[in-house]
């Protein structure tokens, strides 16, 4: 096995952390097996990622509580000081390992997956092959997936709107997850097959994701009014926990996975817009002022030459990126380009979320109209939307990619709005969704990041994934089938593990404990990095 790049301190520090975790987990499994054998009692694990609450009382017996997806860590883990937990871990105390066996299992599995990433993308153990595009095959595979999804996962929903109390279901969760799912499939196939002719469509899909960032976060904060530190930390964990480890293990810049910093930025901007003077959010004029302020910030940042570079240059260490194939570009070029393409659409998402209750009430009244009037209004909406979509397609979408990118920030709302209108024009369309796509829509972040290393291949730090991972050489379709199956399975596990570990390390109602956890994780990471750096310097 040949390693393609020198080992970094970050990679050594990761191994220093993950190897003891794996040993501790294996030992905890042995302890559980020995205890179960001793008591002649078998405990079944319903889910490998569940968090177990174990209280080991020698005089009173043993109680093991398991079930479903994990929601909280063991009570002893939360109640014990971090220093005590760390000492108990390092000394391999039996009771501690048994109490936190499922947590150790989740951490060990997460580490093993990251090692698999490294093996696939940074060693010669698994081969690589060239991309090959066929429009016929590309469209065939996507249409086949739609047919299979429609035949096996079409589901009718009867959820009621929290606003109107009726089954209007305008832009409901099932629908937006489905939307993310089919866009993600095309986005991934675009990368796998190098389907460059769909470049402009992919730009619209990414705008759709950013639109949902504005729409979803605005809806949550406006309705729930939860601006707590725990909620904020949970968001940042969801967006950046996995990608941070990928940057360490693969020695990549954060901006290689540009979707993550983009969504982080626009999530922060929505959080700031609604969190500042949040007690006045119910006042329409205040909300109008906030949205106008968002537009003003974007105009100042992206439309006035030089401002972007001045503002972001102090963060070039985090947001800078150098493509090995284009080393002469400025470090902030990629961040400027990517964030600038979708600089307005998140605000459009906020506006649509703000008027969502109003539109639902309009739709409720429309459904109560007589059939003739209802049909004429819906026909008009479909006609106007289709005509607007046609004009956009003819005069914007058909432009070459360079010219299209200039218009994209100002026009991406058009196809998104057209899709929303057509997808929600009838009650029947709103009630049904393809749950296969909705399921895929829930793991878009994991599939986006994982594709770089276990589906595609770049082989070098910060390299774009120009190659395909090849487990079965000379059989491209069989290889596609196998690598895709592994890739999706790993993405699902990463989604579950990220949520599992989030529930362990981010308490929802204890900010003091949360702060202690953050400080402890930072201190442990720093110590491991220093040790890794020293170990690499010793040979020299």
Curated annotation (Swiss-Prot):
Domain of life of the organism encoding this protein: Eukaryota
Signal peptide stretch: none
GO biological process: plant-type secondary cell wall biogenesis; xylan acetylation; xylan biosynthetic process; xylan metabolic process
One GO cellular component term: Golgi membrane
Subcellular localization, as worded in the UniProt entry: Golgi apparatus membrane
Residues bearing glycans: 132
Keywords, in A-Z order: Glycoprotein, Golgi apparatus, Membrane, Oxidoreductase, Transferase, Transmembrane, Transmembrane helix
GO molecular function: oxidoreductase activity; transferase activity
Principal cellular location given in the protein's record: Golgi
EC number assigned by the record: 2.3.1.-
UniProt tissue specificity: Expressed in cells undergoing secondary wall thickeningin a SND1-dependent manner, such as xylem cells and interfascicular fibers. Mostly expressed in the middle and bottom parts of the inflorescence stems. Mainly observed in the more mature parts of inflorescence stems, but present ubiquitously.
Result of knocking out the encoding gene: No visible phenotype on cell wall acetylation in single mutant. Severe growth phenotypes (e.g. dwarf and abnormal flower organs) associated with reduction in the secondary wall thickening and the stem mechanical strength in the quadruple mutant rwa1 rwa2 rwa3 rwa4 and characterized by reduced xylan acetylation and altered ratio of non-methylated to methylated glucuronic acid side chains. Absence of interfascicular fibers and xylem cells differentiation. The double mutant rwa2 rwa4 and triple mutants rwa2 rwa3 rwa4, rwa1 rwa3 rwa4 and rwa1 rwa2 rwa4 are also dwarfs with abnormal morphology.
Membrane topology value: Multi-pass membrane protein
Alphabetical list of Pfam families matching this protein: Cas1_AcylT
InterPro entries: Cas1_AcylTrans_dom (IPR012419)
Transmembrane segments annotated in the record for this chain: 7-27, 106-126, 137-157, 182-202, 203-223, 235-252, 256-276, 291-311, 340-359, 377-397, 407-426, 436-456, 470-490, 518-538
Family, similarity comment: Belongs to the PC-esterase family. CASD1 subfamily.
Role played: Probable O-acetyltransferase involved in the acetylation of xylan during secondary wall biosynthesis.
Name of the protein described by the UniProt record: Protein REDUCED WALL ACETYLATION 4
Gene (UniProt): RWA4
